[in-house]
Amino acid sequence: MARLLPPTGTDVFRPLTLESLAEIDRRMAEEAAEQERMKEQNVKVAEEDLPKPTSDLEAGKVLPFIYGDPPPNLLNVPIEELDPYYKAQKTFIVIDKKNTIYRFNTEPACYCLSPFNPVRRAAIRILIHSLFSLVIMLTILTNCVFMAMSDPPGWSKILEYVFTGIYTFEAMVKVLSRGFCIGDFTFLRDPWNWLDFMVISMAYLTEFVDLGNISALRTFRVLRALKTITVIPGLKTIVGALIQSVKKLADVMILTVFCLSVFALIGLQLFMGNLRQKCVLWPPVGWYSDNLTVLSNYTDINGNGTANSTFDYQKYINSEENYYYVPGQMDPLVCGNSSDAGLCPEGYICLKAGRNPNYGYTSYDNFGWAFLALFRLMTQDFWENLFQLTLRAAGKTYMIFFVVIIFLGSFYLINLILAVVAMAYAEQNEATAAEAKEKEEEYAKIMEQLKKQAEQKNGMVNGSKTSLSSKKKGDNDQMQSDYDGIALKPLSKSNGSKGNINYLEVPDSQIRKPSVVSAVESALDAQEDIERPCPPGWYKFADIFLKWDCCIPWVKFKRIVYLFVMDPFVDLGITLCIVLNTVFMAMEHYPMSVHVEEVLAIGNLVFTGIFAAEMVLKLIALDPYYYFQVGWNIFDSIIVTMSLVELMLADVEGLSVLRSFRLMRVFKLAKSWPTLNMLIKIIGNSVGALGNLTLVLAIIVFIFAVVGMQLFGKSYTDSVCKISSDCELPRWHMADFFHAFLIIFRVLCGEWIETMWDCMEVAGQGMCIIVFMMVMVIGNLVVLNLFLALLLSSFSGDNLSASDDDGENNLQIAISRITRGIDWIKAFVNKHVRQCLNLKPKEEGAKVNGEGDAKMNAIMNSSSSMVKVPIANGESDDDDGNGSSEDEDDEGRDINMKKKNGDESSTCSTVDKPPEVEDLVEEEEEDLTSPEDCYTENCIRRCPCLDLDVSQGKGKAWWNFRKTCFAIVEHSYFETFIIFMILLSSGALAFEDIYIEQRRMIKIILEYADQVFTYVFVVEMLLKWVAYGFKVYFTNAWCWLDFLIVDVSLISLTANILGYSELGAIKSLRTLRALRPLRALSRFEGMRVVVVNALVGAIPSIFNVLLVCLIFWLIFSIMGVNLFAGKFYYCFNETSEEVFDHNVVNNKTDCYELMEFHPEVRWMNGKINFDNVGMGYLALLQVATFKGWMDIMYSAVDSRAIESQPVYEANLYMYIYFVIFIIFGSFFTLNLFIGVIIDNFNQQKAKLGGTDIFMTEEQKKYYNAMKKLGSKKPQKPIPRPTNCCQGLVFDFVTQQFFDIFIMVMICLNMVTMMVETDDQSAEIEEILFYINFAFIILFTGECVLKITALRYHYFSIGWNIFDFVVVILSILGIGLADLIEKYFVSPTLFRVIRLARIGRVLRLIRGAKGIRTLLFALMMSLPALFNIGLLLFLIMFIFSIFGMSNFAYVKKEVGIDDMMNFETFGNSIICMFMITTSAGWDGLLAPILNSPPDCDPDVDNPGSTTRGNCGNAAVGIVFFCSYIVMSFLVVVNMYIAIILENFNVATEESSDPLCEDDFEMFYETWEKFDPTASQFIDYNRLSEFCDTLKDPLRIPKPNTLKLITMDIPMVTGDKIHCLDLLLALTGEVLGGSDQMDGMKATMEEKFMANNPSKASYEPITSTLKRKQEEVAASTIQRAYRSHILKRCVKQASYMYRDKTGSKKPTGEAPEKVGMIAENMRSLYGDQAVEDDHPVGCSFSQHGKTQFGAKRPPVKVQSDVVLHSAPFPVPESSTAADNLRESIV
């Protein structure tokens, strides 16, 4: 805290002097000495304790206000450091006029310019001047404009030199002021300056050195656009976030590339060469022999059998004239030779010839092209084309391949990228918010500190000051008084979250005032300034001219106007006018009669008048001053002004754009429509946050557009004939900047492959792939996902609360008034009618019921409930808890719910929430043990005969009958039977295709089956009626569904019996049988969970967003109608299939003249057009899903005037309309669906207490098992064989190295497979065969070795069985390759399967943790994804059946052909699967939109009684739009929600210090120490075990003390249990915490459940206790020994004196009896001294020799002498095992 307090006094800012430099040197020397001292003393400082720079004093930040203003003479000159961190570093700062801090190095710049050098000072002044950066910015922008010119003027070369000169000058200034690269804060130490350096170097390099390809090098100039990032401050941070997210994407990228490689290999093996199969015209007669045997050398054979080589077979089949082309297609028709592949027309044969489709770039012929195809499939770009080509060439069964890749690659991996980007963004947001909060607290503390200082300084005078400032604070709660009484706005919530920290930006002039009075004045001034941001003159002007309070009559008039114009009814009227105006605008269409046009024009005038009047009245009522303070009023005034301007300029040509401003009126609805308001807010918030991101995106788009133009522009113009038949530039090219920009924008929309093919064809493959991939990855995957992440974050929390004003809006008040009025009239009429009819008896009842009801209704209907009801705990008025934060209340609410269970809810409460559907279902399932009442109480009251006595007679019989029915219905067999019947009846629908008429037998069977199913379902329904009663049956949503479907079947069955089956109405009713599979929903728990919990819950919010999207799109649709209605028509020649040139036919009149003489000429309209708002919506849906949007855009861009022939790119800038719509209509609104679903998903989760809502109980168990595998128990390791050779093999194969070696071999095997190509030579094929053979031998060897070593245990491991099967299949594959390939799939596929083994090796690589997390997230998502997949299949099934019954006979053109159609169930499913990702639906819809003369309603369909090949346009549009909304927007987005959720969970899991792999590793190590799997190891092996573990659980040696302190429980026999040890080690890693205790408990429980044996081994001690016992014992021992020793010495001394007689001992001997006395006696005995020199240890003491006693016996010596002295402390070298137990 103290570090932020500036030094008090006036000397905060000190100029830099020579003394300052000396001081810095002194401090540096001190610091170096201190570090040296710490190094010597081995003192380590934790990283977080190291000093850090103060964030507020970083270079580029504004000086904190706390420092006050620097004196003017110290601005723009070097001054001493303010940041304590840099005090001991060679730096100084410079502060400019705006108080921005710049930091420089004190070392001489370029070795010669010291900080005092005038040149350097001048450079510094220039560098920090605001004009300098402005000039540079303008230079960059001007340079960008010139770079974007495709054909710059001649003098631009001179400008180029000027730009280079300015950049050089900038760099020179930076180098002179900062120094070049040595030391901190020099020029090259800032990575952004590297960019400048490169740009300038390249400019000089290309100028003076001839480097060949100049255009490629000139593209480096584009990097100058990046310099904008260095100049605009906010951009650096967003680029930082982008770089962060790219770093985080590394793992996803690796996983994606790996998966794509695997899929590409599979594609390579399955489809290599297939796409070259084409329909070739049968060769001329006579090229083959009579018996049709083709000779191998393909020579022509004449009639008599002699070979004739004039016919060149290769040339014939490679000639493009001999191929079959579908009209309008560039490539020949692809075909296949399998039974379910595409067939050729009559007279053609399917052969492999020529090149691949799309210039030869779409193929699986080698790994590179296969990888590109799979990447395209994963990004879903034009994948329907690849899908159709592959199915046509290989067969429909291969749809499975695409299903797997779309679900795994496209839905999973691409969304993982979104998840990672969203997480990176969220993390950054949190960090910013946390930093802001921290600063806020810090500054609050500083304020306190300064306040205290000020108080101490000012003494008693302070009293008056504080009272004044506190009074001020009382007046305005928004203010905080600081230390000088200066009012400061606290950080608002929004500011905090966005990181705009404004609390530093208080006018600095008011800081550190000398006197108290002036301090108070300054506080008041500051307050005024904050409230009134404009100069004072403005306020005087406003008071005079903008506040109209001139005289009393006027004021009274104003008040009347105010009462009128602010009345809720007027608001209601205006809202209705807005709606009506919108309807009027939406009524415009083409062709429109003059009368309608007049009505609409008058309507527009009326509405404009109404809105203008409203504005004028509000201006009068509120005064302009207050009127323009409200955002909505400003919005209104702009629109009204624009409308009036438009009316004035109505006749001016080209200003029709002003008409579109009227459309903005629709947004006024947001005032009273919370969801629309919320959406606009979210877009507003996002646009705020997206400001910088949009700039970055714009820079990226600009750079790539210029790069494309510079690199490929010339190639497009030179090689245009390769991609265009008429050698004219196509629509998508890079020859000029605008078209290059459009191509880059198209790539950002996800459509890159088609433009890339063109680029590769004209400019070569390498460069195009690099540029397009960079745009795709950087632009589309990263930046656009960041957009989405921002949108999702806008959804969170605050923004979702309803409108700002918590009160209700005027509209609700008006409506509640109306409803109350109606209720009052009803009651009044009712009362008078009863009086007239003299209904006396019911009068009181009428009073009670009539008025009571009316009142009650009024209460119920008025949105603000008048009645205040005490609500029981656990209830709430609305879902979001009245705007109170849910987080706080959730827990309490849960507890209350559990306690009360709803018992205390107030009976009369009008706000009780009705139980939700799911609750009802649950209750019925659980509570019904016997039948309930058949009828409701009201029914029984009305018809008393229904109330039977069930205790006797008929009533009892009826009750028993009901109970029997109930038992039947509730029986599990009954349910299973019904499910079986539902599946059968649904399956039967799939057979009713176009061939049913030809299969009479199947048709008859189906008719009878249909009757049977109907009877079964009717019986089921009747049984349920009897069993459950009507009340229960008809209050259950699922039963209603059953009821309606059974009704449909009954009606169609009855019609068949009566012979009305061909009636149109009955036919359309029969199509509703397609809904039958829906009944399966209620029966399959998995799907019901998804549908009820997730979908039904989301429907209101999805519907809301859908409505808002429709309103949003309505604006664009009406605008489209204004711009393009009637302009999409063209004159067309049906014979040549060409559009006439505008020089031949200019307009409709010319075309009709031609038509008189040429019947093949037609004046046609585009099928998708903007002739009315409805068609406009359809067109916009195609644009938003990027399907069919090209044709719409081409028509728009070519359009001229109504009924005029289109001209190529006549209206080029209409592209901008579509660009704007794509940004707002597609990026924003479609992504809102994801936002809403995720948000709803989280709300549902919160309701259910955080459990996963997409899973059943069973699946949750699986999920939890996946989440924590901590309950593993030790396994018995495979015993090592006793045989010596086997033992060696065993040691070899169980090495980790062996595993990794095999993995490397698998990868090498894959690499050799990648080398395969379709057109490889025979030698390469042979080499590859032998390499593969070698690998098979190697893997077989591995298999044999493992079986030898592991014996029968080999087959107890799943992976080994997998390896074994692959090896067997590989061996078989070599021998029976041809046979397997003929009947099954290519045997090489088995090799690809081996790649699955790489999953095993991930565990061994610590670096692969991120990838393991991603795979873990996938595993966790599987159960929920399976349920959603089921639901998706159900929707696909229903729509397929529906499509078959409606569109089976549609004319085959555009997207419908012999493979893609609705003729059979299989084909329908393929089509529906394709549309799931919204791919190709425009092509399928186009033929359905046909009407005569484009189709023939009377044409015969062979083999069927149905006539005609026209579709029903209305049904088609509803069919496709509803399917796209359901599957593409809802179900697929649920996938995204789940993946985001599980990715977050998995990331949390993996960020835990311990993961599953660590537990696995623990148990693997345990197996080696506990071969019998007894779950125990000896205490003496504990140290070695802990050392053997891997991090983070490892405790390296020496670890004895550490293990002792860990207090690990021990059982009898000095053994330690694995769980106890694991818990102790886990505690060591996680640190002691509550979390740890919880974990211990759960692990104990899990382990107990798995291993009941542990209970019998109760711990009796622990490592710590054992040590404490040992220490205690040795301490007692030592004390006792010391005591004994003392007594021994005493006794010895006594006896010595006694024996030697040196001095007669006085008194008795200390020890007469006992051990010491006996031992002493045996030591000395009773004899006299035998000689003068007794044996013993003699030693010199004070120069005299002391004589020892006679040598004692050995036993006594050891017992007394050795045991009675404390041992010396052993040396550290002593081995632990040799230590005596008495050593401590």
From Swiss-Prot:
Lacks the cysteine which covalently binds the conotoxin GVIIJ. This cysteine (position 719) is speculated in other sodium channel subunits alpha to be implied in covalent binding with the sodium channel subunit beta-2 or beta-4. It is found in: Cell membrane. I repeats lie at residues 112-429. It is a multi-pass membrane protein. GO terms for molecular function: voltage-gated sodium channel activity. II repeats lie at residues 550-821. The chain crosses the membrane at residues 131-149, 157-177, 192-209, 216-232, 252-271, 399-419, 569-587, 599-618, 633-652, 655-672, 689-707, 769-787, 974-991, 1005-1023, 1038-1056, 1065-1083, 1102-1121, 1213-1234, 1298-1315, 1327-1345, 1358-1375, 1389-1405, 1425-1442, 1517-1539. Residues 875-892, 917-928 have a biased composition (Acidic residues). Residues 150-156, 210-215, 272-366, 392-398, 588-598, 653-654, 708-736, 758-768, 992-1004, 1057-1064, 1122-1173, 1196-1212, 1316-1326, 1376-1388, 1443-1464, 1488-1516 are extracellular. One of its GO terms (cellular component) is axon. InterPro entries: Ion_trans_dom, Na_channel_asu, Na_chnl_inactivation_gate, Na_trans_assoc_dom, VGCC_Ca_Na, Volt_channel_dom_sf. Glycans are attached at N213, N291, N304, N337, N1133, N1147. Keywords: Cell membrane, Disulfide bond, Glycoprotein, Ion channel, Ion transport, Membrane, Repeat, Sodium, Sodium channel, Sodium transport, Transmembrane, Transmembrane helix, Transport, Voltage-gated channel. The keyword Lipid metabolism does not apply. Residues 367-391, 737-757, 1174-1195, 1465-1487 dip into the membrane without crossing it. Residues 893-903 have a biased composition (Basic and acidic residues). Residues 1669-1698 form the IQ domain. Voltage-gated sodium (Nav) channels consist of an ion-conducting alpha subunit which is functional on its own associated with regulatory beta subunits. Pore-forming subunit of a voltage-gated sodium (Nav) channel that directly mediates the depolarizing phase of action potentials in excitable membranes. Navs, also called VGSCs (voltage-gated sodium channels) or VDSCs (voltage-dependent sodium channels), operate by switching between closed and open conformations depending on the voltage difference across the membrane. In the open conformation they allow Na(+) ions to selectively pass through the pore, along their electrochemical gradient. Belongs to the sodium channel (TC 1.A.1.10) family. Nav1.4/SCN4A subfamily. The sequence contains 4 internal repeats, each with 5 hydrophobic segments (S1, S2, S3, S5, S6) and one positively charged segment (S4). Segments S4 are probably the voltage-sensors and are characterized by a series of positively charged amino acids at every third position. This is Sodium channel protein type 4 subunit alpha B. It comes from Danio rerio.
